[in-house]
Amino acid sequence: LSKLNLIKVFADYHENHEEFDNTVSFSIERVSGMKLIRKYRKSYMINDYLEQNNKVQCIIADHWKSLELIKTNKKKICLIHSKEINHPKGSSLNKKVLSVLNNVDHIVANSNYTKNLAIDLGVEEKKIVIINPGIDQVSEVPEKYLNEAEEILKGKKYRIITVSRFDKRKNHEKVIMAVRNLKE
């Protein structure tokens, strides 16, 4: 994207950010300060930037809160994850989420679960597209790690590996119980 267009990123300040910032092909404006104040400073900086740069075509946000205070009619895309939108229907937080998400052009959900949750909570279905998280494939696993894995799993007949956060809603315990029942 940055090879074809000018990209400007507004991001939170992190120690040693220069190490990362110097490796990318786009401009990063870092915003420091306490979290609550940072939210307002960042939105002020973005609104000011949009006023001064009329060639901006699209805003991409990683969270609905990032768009909450942005005042523009430019195209907006917002990424969503279930934990950040999962507020009881009709609650003040749910109403805030809906007022932001139903006023963006496109919403990118990271799973069918998140898409369905968003729809159930009142987000317009036609705006949602799913892009599942990707992974960086390892071209070759070092022998050391293969040996460690073999040692841990030595003598084990069944091997199940899950790559995810251990979260109640992911139902890991049901999978384990189902596998145990298969064994019997």
Where are these regions (language model features)?
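Nucleotide-sugar-dependent glycosyltransferase donor-binding/catalytic pocket residues
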Residues: 136, 165-168, 183-184
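N-terminal strand-loop element at the rim of the active site
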Residues: 2-38
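Nucleotide-sugar donor phosphate/pyrophosphate-binding loop at the beta->alpha transition
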Residues: 38-44, 74-77, 82-103, 144
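Acidic anion/phosphate-binding donor-loop and adjacent secondary structure
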Residues: 88-91, 119, 134-152
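Short His-centered aromatic/hydrophobic patch
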Residues: 61-66
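A short beta-strand/loop micro-motif in the catalytic core of glycosyltransferases
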Residues: 59-60, 103-111
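Carbohydrate-associated surface elements
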Residues: 13, 113, 134
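Conserved donor-binding/catalytic core segment of Leloir-type glycosyltransferases
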Residues: 152-170, 176-179
